[in-house]
Amino acid sequence: ELSELIFSQKIHNNKRPALFFDRDGVLIKDCNYISDPDNVILEKCSKSLVRFAYNQGWIIIIVSNQSGISRKLLSWEDYSKITDKMINLFGKPNPFYGIYANSQGPKSLDKFWRKPNPNMILKAAEVFNIDLNNSILIGDRKSDILAGLQSGIKLIIHVKTGHGFEERKEVINLEKNYSEDFKFINIDNLCEFPKKFLYKIL
């Protein structure tokens, strides 16, 4: 099952790049299948980075696997409350154009929406007329990185927050298999995000 929350009706005539974020361990602390809104804590520098990108005119999208729902560890209602709390913490106006999540688990028969499949990203690109070639993906897991690569995103940023520390070696090995057409940047956390890539979009 896919949850598609669309907050912006701004569909630009010309394709624009987007900043694609994973949620848990990237934007908010990974609390191991978070189900209580009171446990929503922003990762260091996530708010300042998101607001900077928003002010620069970037489309900002969240794409996350939420297998805790299919595992019965939380409900879609819990997910909705967590989403509301997170958006509130990022301040007004809401910087997110769209938030995509799927409940498919690693053992689900249907994994169409589940990362590393790129389909949540491709869906958002269709809805918001996104230029994937010039977009950026930020994730903490190998599955995030693969989803970005398979969707055609050329700039991939891996963080060590969340599961990033334990998956960094695998991510580096993965990066070696891709051509120079792709750019990989491995950072400790969002405070190190190279803002030079977030050029102003008119």
Residue ranges and their predicted role:
Residues S8, D30, K72, K196:
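Residues that scaffold the ATP/ADP-binding catalytic core of kinase and kinase-like folds
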Residues D36-E43, S75-Y79, R114:
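Flexible, glycine- and charge-enriched loops at secondary-structure boundaries
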